[in-house]
Regions:
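Extended aliphatic helical segments
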Residues: 13, 19, 44-46, 54, ...
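Generic structural signal for short, solvent-exposed loop/turn connectors between secondary structure elements
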Residues: 1-2, 54-57, 85, 109-110
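Acidic, Ser/Thr/Gly/Pro-rich intrinsically disordered interaction regions
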Residues: 1-37, 98-211
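Short, contiguous, well-structured surface segments enriched in hydrophobic/aromatic residues
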Residues: 24-53, 63-92
């Protein structure tokens, strides 16, 4: 992950203090505080999003490292979404329908939605899962085993146990290069937001010139 992307983005935000002036009281809300929070947390996690920090071993230490890797991606992605909503003034999120990153899906879903499943099973709440694991329209309850490498086809895996006696466990595999690609694609979206900031700043300055 290129640390220069967030550095350039922060420089663009802080240029001439115009983003501060525009967003510290926008439609009755202090969006400047959200912008600062998002930038700060991207700074915190970006260097941890590196496959050198994870291991394919089947032990507790590797499980914690993968958990940290996934949660750092999640924090970065949530921050980018917040920035997108503010600067584009929309409730939508980027890459909503993209499906090209995760090539080993257990069920069909967008990359954004499938990452939520990965986050839940490997990090956020593995003992309380409710998702479309078998591809059916109706969600089902599952409970993840410990995560580890070497017991399925992926770099890292969990077994998903069902609460139904007649249903077998499923394997959910993840591949570190796919997770990194997911992260890099969304992190690079900061460049698109930067372009929007430049346009907004020009509009703001032109509006004052016309007064």
């Amino acid at each position: 992950m290129d640390k220069e992307i967030i550095k350039r983005f922060r420089d663009e935000v802080n240029a001439q203090d115009l983003v501060l002036q525009m967003y510290r009281n926008y439609a009755g809300k202090n969006y400047w505080n959200i912008i600062c929070s998002a930038m700060d947390w991207i700074d915190v996690v970006v260097e941890m999003i590196d496959i050198k920090n994870v291991s394919k071993k089947n032990d507790n230490d590797s499980s914690i490292k993968v958990m940290t890797f996934i949660m750092c991606i999640d924090v970065m992605w949530e921050a980018v979404q917040q920035l997108h909503r503010i600067f584009f003034d929309t409730s939508t999120i980027p890459f909503a329908d993209n499906t090209e990153v995760f090539c080993h899906k257990l069920f069909q879903a967008s990359d954004n939605d499938y990452f939520k499943t990965i986050r839940a099973c490997f990090a956020a709440h593995p003992i309380n899962l409710n998702d479309h694991f078998t591809g059916n329209k109706q969600k089902e309850r599952r409970y993840a085993s410990w995560s580890g490498g070497g017991f399925s086809s992926g770099d890292f895996s969990v077994m998903l146990y069902s609460n139904q006696p007649d249903k077998d466990a499923l394997f959910l595999d993840i591949y570190f290069d796919e997770l990194l690609k997911f992260a890099e694609q969304r992190y690079a979206y900061l460049n698109t937001i930067s372009t929007k900031i430049v346009w907004q700043r020009e509009q703001y300055l032109n509006s004052w010139k016309s007064i």
